[in-house]
A protein has these predicted regions:
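Charged DNA-binding/catalytic regions of mobile-element recombinases
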Residues: 1-155
Length: 155
């Protein structure tokens, strides 16, 4: 599942696209940029593909944002044998898992800080995702395990 959000900094908006594994809740791909566009979504997708090496025909769900509907993004999906799925119009519940992640990110990090520059926000978001959220943060839906700990118990 993939989606985008924005974080306001002293230099303007910094956009973040994330790819979430719905089963383990792990953020497997992400990218940040001052521009919310197809190259940003493609960067997050490529990171996810590199980390996961998904099986052909895996479904990647997103909302109907223009960056996810772009020909360039769809071409990269096709190159990796992935199938696109998009939310029903006006139905935020289709993206509930990643909207929950955005809520956690914002309430646990963003709303408590004022980021003067992009680099400051990038560093904090990187640490939140890679050090805290994926490795440490417990999820009730995962029997109170972190995403990485939950995945390690599967193998």
């Amino acid at each position: 599942m993939s989606d985008a959000t924005g974080v306001l900094t002293g230099q303007g908006w910094l956009y973040l696209v994330a790819v979430l594994d719905v089963y383990s809740r792990r953020i497997v791909g992400w990218a940040m940029s001052p521009s919310l566009d197809a190259p940003l979504t493609i960067a997050a997708l490529r990171m996810a593909v590199s980390q996961r090496r998904p099986a052909p025909r895996l479904i990647l769900h997103s909302d109907r944002g223009s960056q996810f509907a772009s020909a360039a993004y769809r071409q990269v999906l096709a190159q990796h044998g992935l199938c696109a799925s998009m939310s029903r119009q006006g139905n935020c519940y289709d993206n509930a898992f990643i909207e929950s992640f955005w809520s956690s990110l914002k309430y646990e990090l963003v709303y408590h800080r004022r980021f003067a520059i992009f680099t400051e926000a990038r560093t904090a978001i990187f640490e939140y995702i890679e050090t805290f959220y994926n490795r440490t943060r417990l999820h009730s839906s995962l029997a109170y395990k972190s995403p990485i700990n939950f995945e390690s118990k599967l193998n």
